[in-house]
């Protein structure tokens, strides 16, 4: 089941991805929620002593969790965790169907939370500025070292070196490396933080531009940290990292977004025959009517370490 470091793309091609977990963080999350299920079975059905015999209680447990008011994202996580363990795929008739996730019901980093009362913004000012200027996840903040800062000049030098390799002689890893490096051409910033493979979500590698009015302070901290030392030895558990990523995402979107009226009408709706803007994203649900620039959303998505613009629209960009 554990396939850390393996290529998920190749596993999908070979049809072996359903039985594998490619990210250690995903494994930890799944195991955490599976243990909740185990505890439930042990307490309610003490005569059930094996995971095989406990399988019949999966849907009962998930129904209980939904009745208790668990959020839709948590329900999806628990259903996936137990589905992965027992080999129950989402298209299986026995797979528990969690409630749909709606943007308007997301509470994470929306408004004040109890934990905010235990977090001093003044004492953690540098951390907050660092997060808002880099958009890193908590796991990435915990992992980056002094050696993980790089300039656009150095990135372009590596691109030039790799492009000298004849295309017919380039390996798949070289082509992938080139794609990652070339993503930095979407940005104008000179300094980037290198998120190495295996650190971020899904193990994806990327270069996040350092942006905003506190960029110099962030760069200075990175440069002042020895190459083999962590930039942040301690990150307050109550720091709202997701909220700071939202600020970072919104800043990048605003820097690259075109005025909606300036985006060309470049396609025709087959049903109505009316001209349409293919590069305009139409928000849904509680934000219906809002329009966003798809090109700017993609740039924002790359900086955050995502590959889907709808994730950016639903979870990060705000206040527009």
Task: Annotate the PLM regions.
Residues 1-18:
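N-terminal DNA-binding module of tyrosine recombinases/phage integrases
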Residues 16-91:
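Non-catalytic DNA-binding core/recognition domains of DNA-processing enzymes
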Residues 59-63, 67-68, 87-116, 199:
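Flexible interdomain linker/hinge and immediately adjacent N-terminus
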Residues 131-187:
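Short, charged phosphate-coordinating catalytic segments
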């Amino acid at each position: 089941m554990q396939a850390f470091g393996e290529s998920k793309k190749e596993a999908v091609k070979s049809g072996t991805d359903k039985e594998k977990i490619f990210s250690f963080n995903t494994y930890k999350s799944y195991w955490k929620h599976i243990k909740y299920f185990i505890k439930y079975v042990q307490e309610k059905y003490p005569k059930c002593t094996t995971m095989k015999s406990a399988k019949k209680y999966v849907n009962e447990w998930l129904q209980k969790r939904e009745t208790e008011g668990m959020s839709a994202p948590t329900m999806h996580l628990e259903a996936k965790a137990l589905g992965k363990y027992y080999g129950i795929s989402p298209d299986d008739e026995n797979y528990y169907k969690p409630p749909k996730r709606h943007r308007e019901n997301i509470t994470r980093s929306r408004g004040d939370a109890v934990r905010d009362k235990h977090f001093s913004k003044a004492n953690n000012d540098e951390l907050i500025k660092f997060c808002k200027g880099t958009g890193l996840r908590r796991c990435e903040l915990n992992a980056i070292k002094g050696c993980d800062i790089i300039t656009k000049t150095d990135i372009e030098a590596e691109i030039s070196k790799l492009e000298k390799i004849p295309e017919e002689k380039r390996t798949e890893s070289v082509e992938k490396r080139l794609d990652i490096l070339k993503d930095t051409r979407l940005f104008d910033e000179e300094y980037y933080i290198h998120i190495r493979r295996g650190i971020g979500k899904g193990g994806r590698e990327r270069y996040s531009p350092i942006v905003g009015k506190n960029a110099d302070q962030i760069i200075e901290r990175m440069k002042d940290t020895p190459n083999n030392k962590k930039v942040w030895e301690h990150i307050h558990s109550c720091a709202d990292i997701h909220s700071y990523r939202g600020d970072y995402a919104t800043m990048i979107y605003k820097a690259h977004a075109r005025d909606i009226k300036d985006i060309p009408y470049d396609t025709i709706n087959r049903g109505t025959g009316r001209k349409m803007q293919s590069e305009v994203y139409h928000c849904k649900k509680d934000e219906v009517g809002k329009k966003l620039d798809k090109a700017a959303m993609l740039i924002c998505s790359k900086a955050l370490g995502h590959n889907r613009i709808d994730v950016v629209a639903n979870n990060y960009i705000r206040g527009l």
